[in-house]
Amino acid sequence: MRVRVSPWALSEMDSEFQTNKTNDIWDVVVIGGGPAGMMTAGGSATRGRKVLILEKNETLGKKLLITGGGRCNLTNNKVDTREMLLHYKGESDFLFSAFSQFSVKDTLDFFHNHGMPTKEESGGRVFPVSDRAQSVLDVLIGIIREKSVKVRSNSPVTDVSIDKTTGLFNIKTKGATFIAHSCVIATGGTSRKE
């Protein structure tokens, strides 16, 4: 399968979006530029936080573009959270807490409110009407860009520690150390064959 990377996905290289500053103290540093990382960063920035995403790849959302055969199965439209979680073996306790905070309806409303219509297919699977994962990525990158989230790509994190004196996080990459009040690890999981 060929994956097309849109100009939006490469826009983190733009000077106003990409950062090389290492001496700033960030409110939030998010490790991982996948969907969870971008949602976390966008939500934090919406609340007025100064946010940095550290991404190991050159572009954000790289694995997102191949999910669902390149179509991106956003969610499962089973209205009852407990029923939906039957489809996720072994992780239901953790996921129940997460889905109780941001439900399937919240997910659908979020994308609809950002101009991305969805459709439901067999088994309650929900996809963008465009049948393109790129549509999902464009929404997420558009939000973090609008909220002035900064991104440092090609920056795999090598260590995270807490300074005992200041209580601040020290997040190290190969080339720099970033300091933050909060650190969110949103590195995602391994890809699986469909």
Question: Across the structure, where does each feature detected by a protein language model lie?
Answer:
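Extreme N-terminal leader/targeting segments of oxidoreductases
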Residues: 7-28, 46-48
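Phosphate-coordination loops involved in phosphoryl transfer and adenosine-cofactor binding
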Residues: 25, 121, 154
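Short coil/turn connectors at secondary-structure junctions
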Residues: 25-26, 47-49, 60, 147, ...
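N-terminal Rossmann-like FAD-binding beta1-loop-alpha1 element of flavoenzymes
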Residues: 26-53
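Residue-level detector of alpha-helix initiation sites
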Residues: 30, 34-36, 59, 189-191
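Conserved N-terminal/central alpha/beta ligand/cofactor-binding core
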Residues: 56-150
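Predominantly flavin-linked oxidoreductase catalytic cores and closely associated redox partners
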Residues: 134-135, 139-194
